[in-house]
UniProtKB/Swiss-Prot annotation:
GO molecular function, one term: structural constituent of ribosome
NCBIfam families: rpmI_bact
Cellular component terms (Gene Ontology): cytosolic large ribosomal subunit
Classification via SUPFAM superfamilies: L35p-like
Alphabetical GO biological process terms: translation
The name this protein goes by in its record: Large ribosomal subunit protein bL35
Family: Belongs to the bacterial ribosomal protein bL35 family.
Ranges of Basic residues composition bias in the record: 1-16, 38-49
Region feature Disordered, mapped onto this chain: 1-49
Length: 66
């Protein structure tokens, strides 16, 4: 059986925090800002943590990433 590889697409989008949680950036932030409210644009700037339901799958994609 070959070794598992780190999923490079996921590795570029997620960073591990000091406590081991995974931090991700928000979607919908590249264009079409004219029809988004100021509040929505401000909230999109903040990073979020990967949800508990997705954590197992994402950790499997990032098998060797520290």
């Amino acid at each position: 059986m070959p070794k598992m590889k780190t999923h490079r697409g996921a590795a570029k989008r997620v960073k591990r925090t000091a406590s081991g949680q995974l931090k991700r950036s928000r979607a919908f932030t590249s264009h079409l800002f004219a029809n988004k409210s100021t509040k929505q644009k401000r909230q999109l700037r903040k990073a979020r943590l990967v949800s508990k339901s997705d954590m197992k799958r994402v950790k499997q994609l990032l098998a060797y990433k520290k």
